[in-house]
Structures are given as C-alpha cells and as structure tokens.
C-alpha cells in the first residue's frame, strides 16, 4: 500500500523531520516508526536522538533525587588534564584559541566555536593551517563530552554511550 500511494507517507515524514535536522538516518525496522535525528548544529551521530521520543524533563531527575544542573549535563565537561592528555604539546595553543576557563576551573568553548558546525566551518576556512586540521577530530570529540542533549522543545535525551564519556 505504501508503493500504491507513491511513497507519499515517507515523503511527508521525511519532509516534516527535515525541520529538526539536516541529516536523517533510517535504522532497520525502527526507521518505520522513529528516525535518528542529528540537530543541525551537530555533525557526529552520537549527538543525535530518536524522533519521536519521550524526552526527559527536569522533574524526572528531581523525582529520583538527582540534582539537575543543565549546564553540567548538556555542556562539554572539559578539564585541564583532559586537554593536556588529548593535545599534548599543543594544549596551550588549543586552550588559548578555542576555550575560555570558567569560574569552576573547567573549560568552555568560546562562543565562536560552541557548536560542532561552527568549529568545522572555522577549520575548513583555515586551509593553510595544518595545525587546525590535525586537532579538528579531537575538538569535535570534546563537543560530545556531554551526558544529555536538549531538544527544540526543551526535553532532554541521553547521549549515546554517555557512560563512556569523561563527563
């Protein structure tokens, strides 16, 4: 029956979901019911979640006696030692160029690099900068050092393999 309707249902579904992400992944049988959605500011699949999904909210955590700190759960958790372990001799340059240190002694991406998309666009513009090309994958990785993803409706989804992050 789907073919008889010229796959109209699929076309509508994909068009609707394109409002939420630039890339969609159909995954086996789940593709008939849910689509893996990667928000437009992200590049890597680990920063996506299924749509539709029942998102978590702050009360879901509070009801389980878990203090909810949106910044802690949804922003990369980057320590000085993590930067040194990843970037070795380039850690000083990376800190100065891409990060600001916050009041807790952790590092936040500067506004101009606070999404994977912004970071990738900057690196692609720096064609002569071999140093930037080498560190791109590590910087993208640091963007995924989170526990939760916040969706457009202010719901929260666990990051894939969040238990394997340093966060």
Task: For each feature predicted by the language model, list its residue ranges.
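Catalytic cores of glycan-processing enzymes that make or break glycosidic bonds
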Residues: 1-167
């Amino acid at each position: 029956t789907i073919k008889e309707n010229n796959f109209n249902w699929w076309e509508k579904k994909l068009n609707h979901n394109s409002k939420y992400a630039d890339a969609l992944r159909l995954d086996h049988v789940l593709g008939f019911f849910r689509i893996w959605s990667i928000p437009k500011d992200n590049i890597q699949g680990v920063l996506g979640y299924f749509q539709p999904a029942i998102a978590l909210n702050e009360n879901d955590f509070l009801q389980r006696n878990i203090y909810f700190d949106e910044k802690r759960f949804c922003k990369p958790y980057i320590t000085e030692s993590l930067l040194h372990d990843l970037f070795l001799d380039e850690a000083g340059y990376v800190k100065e160029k891409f990060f600001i240190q916050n009041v807790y002694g952790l590092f936040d991406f500067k506004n101009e690099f606070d999404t994977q998309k912004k970071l990738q666009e900057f690196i692609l513009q720096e064609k002569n900068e071999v140093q930037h090309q080498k560190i791109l994958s590590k910087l993208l990785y640091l963007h995924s050092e989170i526990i939760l993803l916040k969706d457009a409706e202010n719901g929260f989804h666990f990051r894939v393999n969040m238990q394997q992050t340093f966060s």
